């Protein structure tokens, strides 16, 4: 009887270990590369599979955190304009930028602001949060 319980416990333990290992592997995401130069400009990407819209905001000359009333740059998940695969939840944009230092964030569904988890540097945003930093050479 004790041997039977020990075998049953071992099988149950092994099953739980296998299931928990398999489940945790589903949460590991492929790390995206930080913004980098491509022929047309700087390539930005952000992983947001459940988003309906993702925008790029920053102190770029053409939007300056909306200081001039312009719109944020619209990122795509449609397989066009720098986006590689439509519908994969990876939003992308290629933005022409001159050499300089830029601070930026991603705006998801118009109201949630996020730093770039792949950025090489962040800085205090002056409001208790952080901005991602990009240096274009």
Q: Which residue stretches match the model-derived regions?
A:
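Structural beta-strand segments of beta-rich domains
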Residues: 38-44, 52
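N-terminal edge beta-strand
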Residues: 26-40
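Bacterial N-terminal signal peptides that target proteins for export
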Residues: 2-11
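Aromatic-rich carbohydrate-binding modules that target alpha-glucans
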Residues: 49-99, 109-136
């Amino acid at each position: 009887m004790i041997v039977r319980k020990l075998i049953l416990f071992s099988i149950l333990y092994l099953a739980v270990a296998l299931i928990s290992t398999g489940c945790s592997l589903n949460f590991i995401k492929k790390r995206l590369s930080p913004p980098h130069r491509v022929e047309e400009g700087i390539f930005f990407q952000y992983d947001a599979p459940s988003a309906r819209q993702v925008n790029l905001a920053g102190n770029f000359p053409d939007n300056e955190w909306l200081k001039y009333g312009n719109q944020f740059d619209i990122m795509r998940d449609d397989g066009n304009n720098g986006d590689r695969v439509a519908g994969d939840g990876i939003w992308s944009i290629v933005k022409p930028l001159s050499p300089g230092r830029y601070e930026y964030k991603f705006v998801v569904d118009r109201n949630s602001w996020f730093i770039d988890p792949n950025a090489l540097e962040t800085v205090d945003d002056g409001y208790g949060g952080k901005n991602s930093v990009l240096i274009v050479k």
